[in-house]
């Protein structure tokens, strides 16, 4: 991706200081999603590394990963799998606990959403500490999926999430980096 595209995408993301608490800069992609050109460009860039590759499923993490993941799945002619917070899915699920910056939570997916050996890409808006993405990777692998990659619009490299995923052997693709929290 060229620098001009990176700059355009970064400019389409709203930064909100001191949200959700003092010292944090929240990176809000709703402005990117509301801009047809930026949204299309972001999806095209998320898809690009996998063009021509057979990907069975895209796993989107709640909630913005649903928006981006659905668009990526459509472009790759893949199925879409929502990974949700505990208690939100109506059928038989598999669940995993994962670490958050300040505690532990659980996520789940339908047990029959991915078959053993299927190639899956994780999609979300942002990778920070990596807790959610690492948890989703472990959940997918628990049911036999092959996690072939993960893509995010935003990387906050100072928080180390990308490195944690790469240590699990997941190839990570991001579009924009912001320093800090």
Curated annotation (Swiss-Prot):
It is found in: Cytoplasm. Pfam families: Pribosyltran. InterPro entries: Ade_phspho_trans, PRibTrfase_dom, PRTase-like, UPRTase/APRTase. Pathway: Purine metabolism; AMP biosynthesis via salvage pathway; AMP from adenine: step 1/1. PROSITE patterns: PUR_PYR_PR_TRANSFER. The keyword Zinc-finger does not apply. It catalyses: AMP + diphosphate = 5-phospho-alpha-D-ribose 1-diphosphate + adenine. Its EC number is 2.4.2.7. Catalyzes a salvage reaction resulting in the formation of AMP, that is energically less costly than de novo synthesis. Belongs to the purine/pyrimidine phosphoribosyltransferase family. This is Adenine phosphoribosyltransferase. It comes from Rhizobium leguminosarum bv. trifolii (strain WSM2304). The lineage of its organism: Bacteria, Pseudomonadati, Pseudomonadota, Alphaproteobacteria, Hyphomicrobiales. The gene is apt.
């Amino acid at each position: 991706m060229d620098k001009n595209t990176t700059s355009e995408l970064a400019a389409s993301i709203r930064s909100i200081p001191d949200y959700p608490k003092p010292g944090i800069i929240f990176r809000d992609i709703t402005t990117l999603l509301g801009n047809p050109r930026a949204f299309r460009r972001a999806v095209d860039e998320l898809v690009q590394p996998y063009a021509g590759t057979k990907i069975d499923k895209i796993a989107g993490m709640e909630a913005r990963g649903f928006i981006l993941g659905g668009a990526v799945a459509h472009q790759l002619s893949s199925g879409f799998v929502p990974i949700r917070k505990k208690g939100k899915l109506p059928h038989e699920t598999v669940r995993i606990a994962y670490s958050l910056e300040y505690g532990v939570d659980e996520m789940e997916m339908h047990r029959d959403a991915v078959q053993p050996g299927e190639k899956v890409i994780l999609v979300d808006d942002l990778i920070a500490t990596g807790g959610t993405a690492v948890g989703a990777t472990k959940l997918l692998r628990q049911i036999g999926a092959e996690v072939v990659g993960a893509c995010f619009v935003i990387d906050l490299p100072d928080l180390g999430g990308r490195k944690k995923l790469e240590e699990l052997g997941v190839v990570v693709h991001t579009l924009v980096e912001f320093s800090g929290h």
